[in-house]
UniProtKB/Swiss-Prot annotation:
GO terms for biological process: monoatomic ion transport. Belongs to the BexD/CtrA/VexA family. Residues 1-23 form the signal peptide. This is EPS I polysaccharide export outer membrane protein EpsA. Probably involved in polymerization and/or export of exopolysaccharide EPS I which functions as a virulence factor. It is a multi-pass membrane protein. Its main location: membrane. Keywords: Cell outer membrane, Ion transport, Lipoprotein, Membrane, Palmitate, Plasmid, Polysaccharide transport, Porin, Signal, Sugar transport, Transmembrane, Transmembrane beta strand, Transport, Virulence.
Length: 381
């Protein structure tokens, strides 16, 4: 039986009608369907979609300001004025009584007592001097056992002067800490030189500790998420937010045993996918990232394949179900809303494809299938 090529073409077209009518459903690639239930067993579990409107943006900005104020209010216990260093257990002292070399520690000289390089001996156990005992005291000739823990260098100097006054007329005493070993803080995470740091006569503020650690790694460190742990309590500090609220991070005074950790920027990344020029992950700057900035980092919505009316932000809520926000970005004015909409860590920004693009993708799938049929008919003829 002879079948003409026109008839075969008609048959191919007829067979193609059914899938083409459902092109959107069969189109390859990802697609956001607001009616698709999250749980296949529960048809009512469709995601709730919240339009991104000026009111929503204003409410989000107000909430962010209130949250920042509460977080900054919590740093009150960390703010303190610097005070003179107080000697502690394990510190090594240099004590010199001028013009009385017999009272100088056997391995020390007058020059050690006056011009010793403290920085090069920061806690080294080989430094010779008077080691503060676990009981917080030292023993000095003619003065006997002296309680020095918790006192400043000047207070210890005055006490030694009074103790030796009966054998030394008008004593001139110099007391200095040679090695600071009683109090340490620990700096970890995304800094250049993590490790422990001894608290010395330079006030150990948060800024000082970070500077001694070489500063925050500008590539991987997140200066908006610095965790400070003290006595079982933890604070999350944001340098930009503190300064914006008028709080100087240099006024945050650390104590012995404090742990400072700079978190990774990578932990706060946002995913941009769908019909954008460069699907990618985007990292925040100074703890902030807006929808407009995220789209800009991804090259913007694709002018060829995207449907700007369907820009979505998918966010995981505390209860586990996703929150979905929708922006109609067809008009450039909508970019002002996108600039005011703050993203959160691990948000997913998705730009849907246009219906014509999905149709085209189905056609591209069907054409390779239909071509062999037409070719076979031509051979049969």
């Amino acid at each position: 039986m002879f079948v003409s090529i026109p008839n075969i073409r008609k048959a191919v077209v007829s067979l193609s009608v059914v899938p083409l009518l459902a092109a959107c459903a069969f189109a390859p690639g990802m697609r956001f369907d607001p009616q698709r239930p999250l749980d296949p067993a529960d048809n009512a579990s469709v995601p709730k979609i919240t339009p991104i409107t000026p009111d929503l943006v204003r409410a989000g900005q107000t909430q962010a300001q209130v949250q920042a104020s509460h977080e900054n209010a919590d740093v009150g216990p960390l703010l303190a004025k610097a005070t003179p260093y107080r000697i502690g257990t394990g510190d090594i002292l240099s004590i010199v009584v001028w013009d009385h070399p017999e009272l100088v520690f056997p391995t020390q000289t007058y020059s050690i007592g006056s011009t010793y390089d403290l920085a090069s001996f920061g806690g080294a156990p080989s430094v010779s001097g008077y080691v503060v005992s676990t009981g917080g005291d030292i023993q000095f000739p003619y003065a006997g056992v002296i309680k020095v823990a918790g006192k400043t260098q000047n207070e210890v100097r005055d006490e030694i002067s009074r103790g030796i006054a009966r054998v030394v007329k008008d004593p001139q005493v110099t007391v200095r800490v040679l090695a600071y070993r009683s109090q340490r803080v620990y700096v970890d995470g995304e800094v250049k030189t993590p490790g422990q740091q001894s608290i010395d006569d330079v006030p150990m503020t948060l800024v000082e500790a970070l500077n001694r650690a070489g500063g925050i790694n500008t590539t991987t460190g997140d200066n908006s998420r610095i965790r400070l742990t003290r006595g079982g309590k933890q604070w999350t500090l944001s340098m930009p937010a503190l300064m914006q609220q008028g709080i100087d991070p240099a006024n945050i005074l650390l104590r012995g045993g404090d742990i400072v950790r700079v978190e990774q920027r990578e932990d706060s990344k946002v995913f941009v996918t769908g019909e954008v020029v460069r699907p990618s992950t985007v990292l925040p700057r100074n703890g902030r990232l807006t929808l407009s900035e995220a789209l800009g980092e991804a090259g913007g919505v694709s002018p060829v394949s995207s449907d700007p009316r369907n820009v979505y932000v998918i966010r995981r809520a505390a209860e586990g179900e996703p929150q979905v926000y929708h922006l109609d970005a067809k008009s450039p004015v909508a970019l002002a809303l996108a600039e005011g909409f703050e993203l959160k860590p691990k948000d997913v920004v998705y730009v849907d494809a246009g219906s014509l693009v999905r149709w085209s993708r189905v056609i591209n799938l069907l054409v390779p299938t239909a071509t062999p049929l037409i070719g076979a008919a031509a051979v049969a003829k």
